[in-house]
């Protein structure tokens, strides 16, 4: 797990000691449409010195009817290369909530291994009163980013329908209990709420320490959380959520405990909930 995380004090020291290193810090903060605000405005109000903003919408598939879907390798390479990320660049990602694991998963899916998440993210950085910048960052020099085609770590609609109908893997859903149960809106206009038959609700927030830490829980604690929700860690797992964002948190924690047999359902509920032929359940109020 330490291979994919960097602590705030470590990053602060690196930025001061070696500011010219082949390193790019990316703020990937993002809001659900129902929030009615844009994360880029928060970035302009304050960000880690030298950081650049990566827009989750911009780095997703522009032609998909579903939000936050993986783009082509060429599209991903164009966006991140334009932010100054090259083949050997160390990428450090952070946000103000729950998005960093999605970018961690995307970079890995496209073949980039030099990727770390700032443990505790922007909230911990600010709580510790570390240096911040405001406004726009300096323009980045575009680099060539050699993205490879996505491999086996992605589950598609037909894969998940097969699992729902015939088994073969556990499906774990990272959304809040209220969204999963269908007692709260999906978060996306026009998309019904509820859950897939057989899915296990495993809320993403259980994998973070409370304020003022905001850090990921330890692998030992993560294993306990999975056990509390009855997740079978002996077989394959598919992670899902509203639109493939917090599902990556579950995947990150599965990797942390050594469970590598997992895939992320990229369309997640935004796709499943809109499909006319998928089974959708709700729990009684």
Question: Predicted segment positions?
Answer:
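Cytosolic catalytic domains that perform sulfur/thiol-centered chemistry
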Residues: 1-285
């Amino acid at each position: 797990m330490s291979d994919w995380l960097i602590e705030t004090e470590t990053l602060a020291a690196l930025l001061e000691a070696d500011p010219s290193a082949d390193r790019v810090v990316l703020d990937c903060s993002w809001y659900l449409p129902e929030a009615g605000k844009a994360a880029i405005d928060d970035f302009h109000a304050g960000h880690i010195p030298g950081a650049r903003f990566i827009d989750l919408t911009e780095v997703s598939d522009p032609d998909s009817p579903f939000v936050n879907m993986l783009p082509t390798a060429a599209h991903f390479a164009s966006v991140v290369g334009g932010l100054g990320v090259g083949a050997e660049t160390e990428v450090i990602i952070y946000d103000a909530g729950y998005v960093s694991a999605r970018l961690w998963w995307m970079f890995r899916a496209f073949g980039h291994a030099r990727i770390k998440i700032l443990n505790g993210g922007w909230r911990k950085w600010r709580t510790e009163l570390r240096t911040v910048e405001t406004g726009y960052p300096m323009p980045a020099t575009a680099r060539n980013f050699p993205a490879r085609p996505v491999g086996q770590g992605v589950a598609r609609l037909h894969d998940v329908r097969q699992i729902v109908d015939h088994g073969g893997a556990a499906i774990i859903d990272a959304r809040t209990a209220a969204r999963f149960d269908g007692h709260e809106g999906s978060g996306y206009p026009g998309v019904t709420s509820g859950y897939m038959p057989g899915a296990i609700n495993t809320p993403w927030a259980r994998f973070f320490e409370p304020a003022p830490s905001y850090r990921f829980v330890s692998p030992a604690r993560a294993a306990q959380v999975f056990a509390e929700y009855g997740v079978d860690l002996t077989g394959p797992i598919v992670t899902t959520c509203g639109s493939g964002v917090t599902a990556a948190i579950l995947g990150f924690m599965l990797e942390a405990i050594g469970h590598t047999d997992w895939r992320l359902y990229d369309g997640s509920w935004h796709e499943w909930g809109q499909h006319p032929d998928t089974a959708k359940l709700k729990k009684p109020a």
